[in-house]
C-alpha cells in the first residue's frame, strides 16, 4: 500500500511541477508581447470578459493567467506535502516501529472522522422537522435503541465497586476447562424443587384417609392396576420374535467351512473339492453294486456276511488301509453280480494274500483274470472311504480333534467315539448285502448322522452337509435301523 501511495504522490508532484512550469512560460510570453506593445488593450479585454465560474463584481475578478498561476502554486505545494508525508512514512517503516504506524493511522482516521458532519440519527416513527425530533403527547422524546448483532450472546455483568476486568484471552487446555466446569457447577442456581416453601400450618387429611372403606377401595384398585401392567420390554421381545417367525427369519446354525484347515495343503486341492464330489456322485451310479442273491445258486446272505466278517478281522490284524477294504468288498459284490460262483471258490476271491499257501499260484492267477475280465478292468471307483472322510470333516469343528480323527481313520483305530460309531455302522453296512447295495454317500451320511445325534450337533451338521448331499435324501429311518442292535448281525 505504501508503495502505491509513493507512486501516486510522485505523480501529483510531477503534475504540479508541470503546471507551475507552464504558467511561468505563459507569463513570460505575456510580458514579451506587452513589451512590444502589440496587445495594449489586453487588460481592457480581460476586464470586459465575463467570468463563467464566479459572478463577482468587476473589481474582484481575476484574470485567467492569475488563476492558472494560483492553481500551479497549489498543485506544487500539495505535491511537496505528499512527497514529504511519504518520506516520513517510509522512514517509519524502515525503522520498524509498528506501534508508531498504528498510532499514525489512528490519528489520520480520527482527523477524517472529525471532518464529517454529525448527522442526527433518525428513529422510525420520529421524523425530523428542522433537525428536531417530534415529541409525543407527554412531552417525552421517542428514543429507540439501535439493533446490534443478533446472536446467542449473554452480556457479562460488570464488577461492582471496582474496575472492569479485561476479558481472559488464553487457550482452553484440559486443566483450564476442568476449572471452568467446576466454577460453573458452584455458581449454578438451585433447582426449583429444592426451594420448598415451609408449611404454614397442618394440612387437612384427605377424605380417603379419614374414611377406612374408601382407603381400602383405593388400595384394591391400585393392586389390580399393578397386576394388569406388564413390562414393555417383554411384550416388545415377544412381538419381534413372532414377526420374525411369521416372515421366516429364524436363527439358523452357522454353516462351517470344513475345508478351511486344508487351504494351505496343495495336495488336498481345496479349489476343486466341489467338482470332485459332484463327479464322485455321478460315477457312483455306474459302480454301485446291485442285488445278486437271486442269481447265486450255492450261496446266500449269511455266507457273504461270514466272508466279509472274516475279511474285517484280517484287515484289522494286518492294519491295512481302510480304502482297500471298501474297494475289495465292492469288487466282490460286482463280480458276484455278473457271475455265479460255486461255494468252494468263494473264499478264493478276496483272501488270496492271507491263505498262507492254501491255494496254488495258478489258481490265484486264474481267479484274478476271471475277476478283471468280468469287471472289464473297471476298478477305480469312489468308495465309502471318500464320503466317510468328508462327513467326518463336517462332523468335527475343532481342527486339533479333526487331525486326530483323520489319523485314526487312516490307521483304522477306533479309540474315539465318532470313529467307533462310524466304523461300527460302516462295517455293518458292508456286512449286510441289502445295505451295501445302496448309495455309498447315503450309508456314510447315515453313520455320521448317528454320531452327531449322540453328540447333540445334529442341526449344525445338517446345515453344513446340505451342500454335500442331495436335498431329497432322507435317512432317519436307516439311522434307527443301524443303531437298533448292539453288534453286527448277519441277517
Curated annotation (Swiss-Prot):
InterPro entries: Cyclin, Cyclin-like_sf, Cyclin_N, Cyclins_cyclin-box
Annotated Cyclin N-terminal domain residues: 275-347
Domain of life: Eukaryota
SUPFAM superfamilies referenced in this protein's UniProt entry, alphabetically: Cyclin-like
Example GO biological process: cell division
Tissue expression summary: Expressed in roots, stems and flowers.
Listed Pfam families: Cyclin_N
Signal peptide: none
Keyword annotations from UniProtKB, A to Z: Cell cycle, Cell division, Cyclin
Transmembrane among keywords: no
Protein family membership: Belongs to the cyclin family. Cyclin AB subfamily.
PANTHER family: CYCLINS
Protein's name in the database: Cyclin-B1-5
Organism: Arabidopsis thaliana (Mouse-ear cress)
Amino acid at each position: 500500500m505504501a508503495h502505491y501511495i509513493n507512486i501516486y504522490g510522485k505523480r501529483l508532484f510531477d503534475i504540479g511541477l508541470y503546471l507551475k512550469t507552464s504558467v511561468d512560460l505563459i507569463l513570460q510570453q505575456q510580458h514579451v508581447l506587452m513589451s512590444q506593445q502589440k496587445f495594449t488593450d489586453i487588460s481592457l479585454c480581460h476586464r470586459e470578459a465575463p467570468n463563467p465560474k464566479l459572478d463577482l463584481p468587476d473589481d474582484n475578478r481575476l484574470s485567467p493567467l492569475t488563476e492558472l498561476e494560483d492553481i500551479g502554486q497549489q498543485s506544487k505545494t500539495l505535491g511537496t506535502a505528499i512527497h514529504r508525508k511519504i518520506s516520513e512514512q517510509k522512514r517509519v517503516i524502515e525503522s520498524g516501529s509498528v506501534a508508531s504506524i498504528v498510532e499514525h493511522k489512528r490519528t489520520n482516521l480520527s482527523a477524517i472522522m472529525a471532518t464529517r458532519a454529525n448527522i442526527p440519527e433518525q428513529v422510525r416513527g420520529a421524523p425530523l422537522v428542522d433537525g428536531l425530533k417530534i415529541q409525543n403527547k407527554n412531552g417525552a422524546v421517542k428514543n429507540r435503541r439501535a439493533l446490534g448483532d443478533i446472536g446467542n450472546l449473554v452480556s457479562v455483568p460488570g464488577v461492582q465497586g471496582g474496575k472492569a476486568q479485561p476479558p481472559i484471552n488464553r487457550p482452553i487446555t484440559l486443566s483450564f476447562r476442568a476449572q471452568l466446569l467446576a466454577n460453573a457447577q458452584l455458581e449454578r442456581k438451585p433447582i426449583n424443587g429444592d426451594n420448598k416453601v415451609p408449611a404454614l400450618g397442618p394440612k387437612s387429611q384427605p377424605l380417603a384417609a379419614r374414611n377406612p372403606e374408601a382407603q381400602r377401595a383405593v388400595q384394591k384398585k391400585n393392586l389390580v392396576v399393578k397386576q394388569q401392567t406388564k413390562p414393555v420390554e417383554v411384550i416388545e421381545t415377544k412381538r419381534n420374535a413372532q414377526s420374525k417367525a411369521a416372515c421366516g427369519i429364524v436363527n439358523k446354525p452357522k454353516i462351517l467351512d470344513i475345508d478351511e484347515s486344508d487351504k494351505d495343503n496343495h495336495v488336498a486341492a481345496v479349489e476343486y473339492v466341489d467338482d470332485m464330489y459332484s463327479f464322485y456322485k455321478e460315477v457312483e451310479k455306474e459302480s454301485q453294486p446291485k442285488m445278486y442273491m437271486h442269481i447265486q445258486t450255492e450261496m446266500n446272505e449269511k455266507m457273504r456276511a461270514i466272508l466279509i466278517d472274516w475279511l474285517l478281522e484280517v484287515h484289522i490284524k494286518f492294519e491295512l488301509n481302510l480304502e482297500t477294504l471298501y474297494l475289495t468288498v465292492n469288487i466282490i459284490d460286482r463280480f458276484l453280480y455278473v457271475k455265479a460262483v460255486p461255494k468252494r471258490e468263494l473264499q478264493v476271491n478276496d483272501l488270496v494274500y492271507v491263505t498262507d499257501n492254501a491255494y496254488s499260484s495258478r489258481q490265484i492267477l486264474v481267479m484274478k483274470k476271471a475277476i478283471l475280465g468280468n469287471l472289464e478292468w473297471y476298478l477305480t471307483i469312489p468308495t465309502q472311504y471318500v464320503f466317510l472322510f468328508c462327513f467326518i470333516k463336517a462332523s468335527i469343528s475343532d481342527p486339533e480333534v479333526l487331525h486326530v480323527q483323520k489319523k485314526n481313520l487312516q490307521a483304522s483305530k477306533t479309540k474315539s467315539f465318532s470313529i467307533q460309531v462310524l466304523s461300527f455302522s460302516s462295517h455293518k453296512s458292508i456286512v449286510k448285502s441289502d445295505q451295501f447295495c445302496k448309495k455309498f454317500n447315503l450309508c456314510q451320511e447315515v453313520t455320521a448322522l448317528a454320531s452327531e445325534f449322540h453328540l447333540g450337533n445334529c442341526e449344525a451338521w445338517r446345515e453344513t452337509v446340505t451342500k454335500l448331499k442331495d436335498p431329497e435324501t432322507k435317512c432317519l429311518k436307516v439311522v434307527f435301523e443301524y443303531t437298533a442292535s448292539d453288534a453286527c448281525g448277519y441277517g
